[in-house]
Each structure stands twice: as C-alpha cells, then as structure tokens.
Amino acid sequence: MANKRNYAKELNTLIETFTHEEKRPTLLLHACCAPCSSAVLEKLTAHFKITVLFYNPNIYPEAEYQKREAELKRLISEMPCTKEVALVDLPYVPEEFFTAVRGLEHIPEGGERCFACYKLRMEAAAKYAAGHHFDFFTTTLSISPLKNAQKLNEIGEALAEEYGVPHLPSDFKKQEGYKRSIQLSADYNLYRQDFCGCVFSKKEREAKAHLSLIHISEPTRLQLIS
C-alpha cells in the first residue's frame, strides 16, 4: 500500500523553496467563507501574491451567500496581512450547483455529492487561474476537519493537468490551521455558519438538531409521566 501523502508538508517544502529562491508566485485562492480563509491568508500572504476567488453557487439561501460574501470582504479589508490581496467575485448562479449534483441529492454529507461540489468550485478557480496566467491555484476548503483533503488535492491535480496551471498542494487543517482559524474568527468577530452551505447540508443539520432536541426532551417527558 502506498504511503499517504502529507500535503501540508509538500506545501511547506514549496514555500521553503520559494523563500530560498526569493520568489513570490501568484496564487488564485478559492475561498469558501471568511473563517476558513482567515488562517489560510495568514499563512500564505508572505509567500504568494494572492487573489481570492469567491465562487460558491452551492450556498443556500441567497441571504446566506450574501452574508458570507460580506464577511469575506470585511476580513480582507481588516487583516493587516491582506493589504495586497485582491478579491474576484463571480456571479451567484445556484443552478450551476444543482446541475453539478443532479442525481446525487440524497447522498449523505461528505460523499460523492460533496466531491462534485468540490470539483465545480475548483474548476472555476482553475479556469480563472489559467485565463489570467496565475502561477498556482488552490482552495481554502481543506482547512475544515469535515473536508476530504486527499480528494480535494486529487481533484486539484486533475484540473491542473486539464487547464495547465499548477495546483498548490494543501491540507490547511494540519499544523493547527483549523484551531488558528477559530482563534482568528473570534479576533475578528466573524460570522461562523453552522452548516457547510448547500440546501442539502442545511436540511441534514436541521434534522440532526431536531433529533438532539428529541433525545434531550425524552428524560423530561419520562419524569413527567412518573
């Protein structure tokens, strides 16, 4: 069995190489939300000239999309390390998400539906990066403990082959990246959503919350009966 790749270590090795060669490559960074972007931007801005791409047609409803978009803009405007960071905001077209996941609607969170969503958003990043001559592209998604870093990197590498722009390997949750994102979210008073983004994850989250309420209330009901 092949050894599991350490994407965080691969990224650190690349950064060391760029530092030694006194290079600061351009990077198109797909961002899913402000909390996930915070620690990633803090880690990368010293080593890359970053443009953030906000393309997330999966987010539901539109008010949620607008809230996450506004928080990302605020974060970029307030973090000291992001003074040179640009933001590209692609149109919000939810139909693109529903087309990408058609037939996968009933698959549980974390499965093939999510992988199709990863690809949709990362492909938009790869296309934009190729069209605007970036040195690399990647996504903030791997900072979440709920996101499959191996799958994200596999998708990124396949898209790199297809579009001719290198994918920057990453597993941003490693080396306490996720923990740092929580701290930065508190420091900047960021809105931290309680579901991934799509209508399916929202419904799944609400169903789990409902079951939790039932379990909590059951002892109370039994006490009343006795």
Question: At which residue positions do the language-model features occur?
Answer:
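Single conserved hydrophobic/aromatic residue that forms the stacking wall/gate
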Residues: 214-226
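Aromatic pocket-lining residues of Rossmann-like dinucleotide-binding sites
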Residues: 44
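Nucleotide-activated chemistry modules centered on ATP-dependent adenylation/adenylyltransferase
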Residues: 1-39, 47-217
